[in-house]
Amino acid sequence: MMSQTFFLISDPDNLDYPIYTVHDKSRILDCFCDISLFKTTTITEIELDNEHPDFKILKLYGNTFMTNRIIKNTKYSLLDVNTVQMLLDYGDPDYEFKSTHYLYVFYMSQNRFDICDYLIASNIKFVGTYTKSCLLNQNTLTNYHLFKYIINNSEFFGCCHYDLMYAAFRYTKFYDLCDHLIKSEYNCNIDYDNFLRQLFNKTDSNGFTINCELDTFQIKKLIDENYFDNEKLFYTVLYDSFELTKYIVEKGFYYDFDSVINSDINLEMLKFFIELGNNLTDDHIMILLSKKYSNDYCKKITFLLDNNYITEKHFTNKIVSDIVWFDLNLLDYLINKLNIIELINLDILMKTSILRENINMIKKCIEYGINVDDYMKFAVDYSICITKKLIELGGNIPDDICIYNPYHSLSIESIDIILENNYDSLENLLLKIINQNKETLYIDEILHIMGKLISTNKPIPDLNKILIKSCYYSDNIYKEIIKLDLNLDNYQQIFVNIMRKEYDNIEQLIFFSTYYNSIELLFVVVLSENIDLFKLLLEINCNDTDYLSWAFVFSGRCFKLMKYIVDNYNVDIYQRQIEVCIMIPKKDYQTKRYLQLMGYEISCIYNTECNNDKLPLVEFMKELSIDSTIRP
């Protein structure tokens, strides 16, 4: 293998320590997915620099390898027919290609149909996964000449006439090609009614989402030429296209208004049919009221109410009960317009209003005779904020009930209520937020409590934990925290200076302190990605094997730090593999590729959850209230 010729498609992002993906010359025609991904039109012939003492190589799949040392030779243009011939000559006659669909799409996208002809003549088959989706999609079919080439070579590409028709109508505005396909002798077996239904699908045959809008011009031509069954056509477009519905109705198509009302039409469609002179009967109104999950339900009911189509007689207990759960604002609008209060279950309405924290509706329930005291326990179980509002509306808390539930989530409003009534202390509330939340959510609440502690000259509990955790998870919170006027000890001052990127006197603070071997400090330095501070700590603790082991584990967070410690210290990089991989950020592919090249198993590198609570790193993170399964 070491004497073989390889091709490099693209240089890696990190050129300080490049890790190259190279492809064996005999299989390069199967690698055009990567060529398309990197949007390149050149490839470079390389040799493996296996004489270099640091040389490493790893087989990824097939004849694709990852290596850290190469010698670049000649760069070739993929748009040169001579290059294509060279790649064909390099091919292994016994190898059966698996993914040449990317190869053909690449050259068609470049309008190099001559090269496609050359490949076809060279017996390079069109094969791969999702070949039709690769060819016939909203991205490739913006190119008129590409689509025309596919049509002319449809048998080679494995595209039946239906596939081409669907693609032409669904993705393009190439009307001449649509006409050509319609008039073709092969279209006689197409079920146009089913064809139209398929055109309105939001996903293709392979389940991929279609984002482009359907152009209706060509469909109107098919309508005019009577390609569809009128009844099937009407109900297909009724569900999916106001434009086409309007078009066929104005052409005089027959429709049954009862069926229209029973369909899931939106407000625009409803208005259109009413404006045509169709009369809404009581049965129609009841159907519309009963379909609470239909398109534009609230808008349709509001429209009908505003235009006097709806009266009290149309409502039942069931309809009103559904609206209570579905939309309190709609219910409020109905109550203000109609006398339907007798149909409302006030107990359910009051509880729903408490859960939705809808004060306006709570007030109405009280006006209608609800005793707010009967709902105080229900409110306490849900939220201290809504409980406080009920108290303001005259509610009384029973002696055996405490308004404060320490297990409820905290908001700034609830924090202030708790403090005003001395239900808990600032210190406890802060610890509760820090310890119970996996990430640094509740940023505003944390800053609110810390601001109150500072203004009252109270110490901030677990400040170290707050600083480290915020540094680990989020730029936003620690940028706000370090703006506060904090009363810091020397240890905390080091943390804050690092977070502020004020490095001038940190080295002295560390060197002359008792914290030089602190694992927490090492953790913060790694999070800062400051290599000078990292070097300082390693130099001071160079004889501490355990400290160096922690440094390597933490360095999973930052590749340049990892590379430094590996190159300069004799650390065992395999001893704590799982912990190292826990530290790697989700999108740090450089570190992942490096460790893979160094012999780490892929299953370890991409393990997103750690089930071993006994690991030292997991225990360390738990002490800081950091969830090791949530990666930044």
From Swiss-Prot:
ANK repeats lie at residues 61-97, 228-250, 251-282, 345-374, 517-546. The keyword Repeat applies. It comes from the Viruses. Keywords: ANK repeat, Repeat. This is Putative ankyrin repeat protein L767. The lineage of its organism: Viruses, Varidnaviria, Bamfordvirae, Nucleocytoviricota, Megaviricetes.
